[in-house]
Structure formats: structure tokens, C-alpha cells
Amino acid sequence: FDSFWFVQQWPPAVCSFQKSGSCPGSGLRTFTIHGLWPQGSGTSLTNCPQGSPFDITKISHLQSQLNTLWPNVLRANNQQFWSHEWTKHGTCSESTFNQAAYFKLAVDMRNNYDIIGALRPHAAGPNGRTKSRQAIKGFLKAKFGKFPGLRCRTDPQTKVSYLVQVVACFAQDGSTLIDCTRDTCGANFIF
């Protein structure tokens, strides 16, 4: 792997695309961690064969922070989500970050990359109104020094686009922010 995508999700938007059933994250009003995804040559590396199995005991010291910062917003089972993310993504960076280090890295990234805190001074926080991709990217670059990636989903009925994820891109060391080069949002979206 040569870099990371640190992906935070906006639970109200994520939940709005769920077709049925309850969504435990619908009431959350802060960005939560979706995952820390190793990248290689511009592609997400997944399901790496040499990885070790998820072991909750290796991250028990982080569990209270993970419950807050990395909840399963779709189903009330956080450990299942962490296991999925470790197996699908984390194992691909295990040569550098073992399981405990991987989850600690994600917690540290979330604590240092506070999206709402960066947008609030610009009155650009979540209010269900139209936002400009250029403005949001600019506010986040002004705060953190590098451009994020913005990921949107479009409602198939209304054709309205909603911000669902913000990606912070990091070098292989997991601490050096780099510019993200990919967005899935158009010029404007609801947030």
C-alpha cells in the first residue's frame, strides 16, 4: 500500500438511503468513522489474503472511543462493523500497522480531523441546505492544509445529491496529510 483514505460518514445522509428498517445512526449529528482504507496505485486494496483475523481483545483498550467515533450506523452491532472493516481493509496495511495500531490510527485521525469543527466558523455546517463543493473543499483545506475528497449519493427519485462521506488522504506513514484527488460530488449538494 502507498497511502490511506480515512473515510468519515455523515450518518443522517447514510441512513436516508436505507430502504427499510431502523437505522441506529439516524440521530447522530457528527461525522463517524466509516473506515481507514489502504490504497495502492490509486485503488482501494481489499481482502488481503495474508491478514490476521479480527480479535476484539487487541483493541479492548480503545473500545469506548470506538463505540463513540466508529459506530455501526446501519445496525446495532459495532464489533461486527469493526471486524468487517479490519478484514476487508485493515489487513492490507498490517505489514506496517497491526490491528491495535490500525484502530488507534483511525481514532487519532478522527480526533485530529474534525469536519464539523472546521466548517462551523464558516456557517457551513450541516443544516440540510445546498452547499458548494468548491466552498466545502476550500474550508477544509484552509483548516487542514490539504484538499479532502467529497463523496455524494443522489436520490434516484428526486435527483438531489447529498454529502455522505468526507475522505482525508494520508501518506503511507498514516500521519502526513496529502491532497485527495477524487470526488463523487457535483458542484452542489445538500448537507
From Swiss-Prot:
Disulfide-bonded cysteines: 15-23, 48-92, 152-185, 169-180
Keywords: Disulfide bond, Endonuclease, Hydrolase, Lyase, Nuclease, Signal
Catalytic activity: a ribonucleotidyl-ribonucleotide-RNA + H2O = a 3'-end 3'-phospho-ribonucleotide-RNA + a 5'-end dephospho-ribonucleoside-RNA + H(+)
Result, substituting residue 72 to S: Altered substrate specificity from uridine specific to guanosine specific
GO cellular component, one term: extracellular region
Nuclease listed as a keyword: yes
Chain positions recorded as RNA binding sites: 9, 34, 72-73, 75, 81, 84-85, 88-89
Role: Ribonuclease cleaving preferentially the 5'-side of uridine.
Recorded family membership: Belongs to the RNase T2 family.
The protein's name in its UniProt record: Ribonuclease MC
Originating species: Momordica charantia (Bitter gourd)
